[in-house]
């Protein structure tokens, strides 16, 4: 007889938000800094934890931080990066990303009552494709380099504009980062509340395997 994790999530106790909030603030700051320093530390484009944060925030963050936190992290880091690249503080891509993250937050809110690892990992994949579709459709609609036709839209979703990496490579990086950070965020909180059981009960349930 051994101990293992079930795929189900246990009922969330009221005390978990009070305990997680300092950790959530640290996480929001970490995500913002991570995104700001990426041009200097390198790594693939679109390898960022924001989509995972938007998805998982509804599970752990109290309202209104479940949506204010990810959107604030987006705008703060976008202002920094846009100014670094010589652009305006807020660009069209910032607004499109904001719309995508709000939709992802809505997915997370819907999944908050369906607490299981398979559901949330599938939600992570769905969030990746949703962000990719919304932001690249916005680029197709606003950038003059794309023909305003189905062929131009297909180009925006696959090869992108000449002189830039194909857009499908951004999708690949997003898939990896969203899955990775979803597991890290959820796993980190669950490990913490089990490591310090006097603070709050874990949301993921522990079970006995026979």
Short names for language-model regions:
Residues 31, 58-59, 74, 78, ...:
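Alpha-helical transmembrane segments of multi-pass membrane proteins
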Residues 1-19, 193-210:
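Membrane-interfacial, low-structure loops and terminal tails that flank and connect transmembrane helices
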Residues 33-37, 56-64, 103-115, 188-196:
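Structural signal for the C-terminal ends of transmembrane alpha-helices
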Residues 57, 61-65, 79-87, 133-136:
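Juxtamembrane membrane-interface segments at transmembrane alpha-helix termini
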Residues 24-26, 67-71, 94-99, 121-125, ...:
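Hydrophobic alpha-helical transmembrane segments
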Residues 116-201:
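Membrane-embedded alpha-helical hairpins and interfacial helices in multi-pass inner-membrane proteins
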Residues 2-61, 65-68:
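Hydrophobic transmembrane alpha-helices
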Residues 35-47, 72-110:
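Interfacial aromatic-anchored transmembrane helix boundaries in multi-pass membrane proteins
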